[in-house]
Design a protein with these regions (language model features):
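C-terminal scaffold of the Radical SAM
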Residues: 3-13, 32-54, 58-345
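Local cysteine-cluster metal-coordination motifs and their immediate loop/turn environment
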Residues: 17-32
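Short amphipathic alpha-helical interaction segments
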Residues: 345-359
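A short, conserved structural fragment
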Residues: 359-369
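Minor-groove-contacting beta-hairpin "wing" of winged helix-turn-helix DNA-binding domains
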Residues: 370-374
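Short, amphipathic alpha-helical interaction segments positioned at domain boundaries
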Residues: 376-393
């Protein structure tokens, strides 16, 4: 599914970045800052103003509140946001996800979100091992995960994603297997499982540079293989490098029914309006990034202006290259007809050499209808993506 947009049609996908966290995790390179009541109130004022500026160009079928920690917003702050969205006719999305930290999910807040149309929760679990949670700087305990999950179910959420991480320093295969087993036993509809990435300017990266631990690529590969096998045995369908979902309907459908439609829109090159500090959207061939500074973001919106840091007009070929790269993260790869409908380019003509390079590496398969990565190729999807990008275009 691709929620494409033209200058005359409304954008059907909305992302909102809530930049506040109770504490910065050791691995996190996303823009966030410590929560502060007054600053959070100013942010809500600015966000509502930004919504007002773009509402006429929006008819969202998917909404995603990410962060940061959106669940940190107070009940009063959430009510203000939800009331504004109702006034601006932004409610009623087919899929509306809110990211939550298990330490910040109250029964009252869960009910409020569900009553206003939020129908999908993504909970940042990362691990169910207390030692690793401390290692990552997470503020929640394993017990909070189970209690928050039950609260969400009681509030009526029947589509819950659990975020997990593997190849964490100090994580053994036994710990990883135990975490997967417990997470699956909870009965969630979706799993997002990411290998730890060592981003510059994060504590974990500095610890790696200082020699406090080593990275074992063989262990990471083994954990990824174990993830795929374990998820499959439990009835999850892998539909993207790091994402697994259950079927609620036709078991032979190309995509599982609980696949995240908002993210699929990204991977399929669809338009997305992005609001909040540091948020990056894609509309009418332009990549639009907001200022990664909450104070400046709020100040700009107080003047009635969008808080853009940059607006980059992509050439058709550059846009198609990015779309090719992102779309190959999905297990179904790119059907040639769909790629041409989406981008206007023939994948077989413009990327023939790149596809052959992937096939020769045993990382990809090319049929008459589509090009997709193999199981081994999915492990190296980021490397493959670099071959398909056309930055000089």
């Amino acid at each position: 599914m691709s929620y494409l947009s033209t200058a005359s049609s409304p954008v059907q996908s909305l992302y909102v970045h809530v930049p506040f966290c109770a504490a910065k995790c050791e691995y996190c390179a996303f823009f966030s800052e410590p929560s502060s009541g007054e600053q959070m109130n100013r942010f809500v004022d600015a966000l509502i103003r930004e919504m007002e500026l773009v509402a006429s160009s929006l008819k969202p079928r998917t909404i995603f509140f990410g962060g940061g920690t959106p669940s940190l917003l107070s009940m009063a702050q959430w009510r203000r946001v939800l009331e504004a969205m109702e006034r601006l006719c932004l409610l009623g999305a087919d899929e509306w996800t809110v990211e939550c930290n298990p330490a910040t999910v109250s029964a009252e807040k869960a009910r409020l979100l569900r009553e206003h149309g939020v129908n999908r929760i993504s909970m940042g679990v990362q691990s169910l091992d207390e030692g690793l949670l401390d290692r990552l700087g997470r503020i929640h305990s394993r017990e909070m995960v189970f209690k928050s999950f039950d609260r969400l179910r009681a509030a009526g959420f029947d589509n819950i994603n659990l975020d997990l991480m593997f190849a964490i320093p100090g994580q053994t295969m036994a710990i990883w297997k135990a975490t997967m087993a417990e997470a699956i036993a909870m009965g969630s509809e979706h799993l997002s499982c990411y290998e730890v990435i060592y981003e510059e300017d994060t504590p974990l990266y500095e610890q790696l540079k200082a020699g406090e631990f080593d990275v074992d690529e063989a262990v990471a590969c083994a954990m990824y293989d174990e993830l795929i096998d374990t998820a499959d045995a439990a009835g999850f369908v892998q539909y993207e490098v790091a994402n697994f979902a259950r079927h609620a309907g036709d078991p032979v459908a190309e995509l599982p029914s609980h696949a995240c439609q908002h993210n699929i829109n990204y991977w399929r090159g669809g338009a997305c309006q992005a609001l909040g500090p540091s948020a990056t959207g894609y509309v009418d061939g332009r990549r639009i990034r907001n200022i990664a500074n909450t104070e400046r973001y709020c100040g700009q919106l107080a003047l009635g202006q969008r808080a853009h840091e940059s607006v980059e007009q992509l050439s058709p070929l550059a846009s198609a290259g990015e779309t090719a790269a992102f779309g190959l993260r999905m297990n179904t790869g790119w059907p040639f007809r769909l790629f041409e409908q989406t981008t206007g380019f023939d994948l077989r003509a413009g990327w023939a050499g790149d596809m052959q390079r992937v096939v020769d590496s045993n990382w990809g398969v090319c049929t008459d209808e589509r090009f997709h990565l193999t199981r081994q190729g999915m492990r190296y999807a980021d490397s493959v993506a670099e071959w398909f990008i056309r930055p000089e275009a």
